[in-house]
């Protein structure tokens, strides 16, 4: 099957057929990596489907940028144990049947351990933290399908969901090999800790609410 003629490659091609919603289409693992190399948009691989993310609106993009900045205050470049990544770095989850997700952002344990599909095409396998910014088009997918797979990553300690429509941050923190604690914070005065560092909702939602 030819990636160039079968699957949308540009943002305009995707927008023309997706209507701003998630677009799913059957794809093989090999075809996924071919498409990932060419596509102008974020794309996941889940249950033998490509799941394409439509163009990010400004509010979503700003939230991802600002929260990544806050994470870099906790995990600076001088910290050789961790590295903050944006959505350009996919995460391979072997424990969930060869799933590949591109979270809005992640913190990856260093030195990195890569899944290498072929030279130059790699995915992270050792995330310490992942976060997703929830929107109308991705909420069901992020919480219903991605979350159970994220929980299967052995070294993952934190999963964060940041709501764009209202002040709400849900923090999943690993308690044991197969147990998680989740707490939702909805007050702008609320705060929570990541690695002993305090994050406040009023900083996360600065100039938003």
Task: Locate each region found by the language model.
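Gly/Pro/Ser/Thr-rich low-complexity, intrinsically disordered segments predominantly at protein N-termini
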Residues: 1-209
């Amino acid at each position: 099957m030819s990636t160039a003629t079968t699957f949308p490659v540009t943002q305009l091609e995707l927008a023309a057929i997706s209507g701003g919603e998630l677009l799913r289409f059957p794809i093989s693992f090999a075809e996924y990596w071919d498409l990932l190399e060419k596509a102008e948009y974020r794309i996941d691989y889940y249950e033998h489907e490509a799941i394409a993310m439509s163009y990010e609106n400004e509010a979503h993009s700003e939230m991802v940028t600002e929260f990544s900045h806050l994470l870099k205050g906790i995990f600076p470049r001088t910290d050789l144990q961790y590295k903050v990544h944006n959505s350009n770095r996919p995460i391979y989850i072997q424990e969930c049947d060869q799933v590949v997700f591109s979270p809005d952002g992640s913190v990856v344990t260093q030195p990195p351990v890569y899944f290498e599909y072929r030279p130059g095409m790699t995915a992270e396998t050792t995330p310490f933290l992942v976060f997703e910014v929830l929107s109308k088009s991705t909420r069901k997918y992020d919480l219903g399908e991605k979350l159970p797979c994220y929980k299967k990553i052995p070294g993952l300690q934190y999963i964060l969901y940041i709501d764009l429509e209202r002040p709400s941050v849900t923090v999943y923190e690993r308690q044991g090999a197969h147990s998680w604690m989740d707490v939702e914070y909805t007050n702008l005065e609320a705060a929570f800790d990541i690695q002993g560092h305090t994050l406040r909702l009023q900083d996360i939602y600065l100039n938003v609410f």
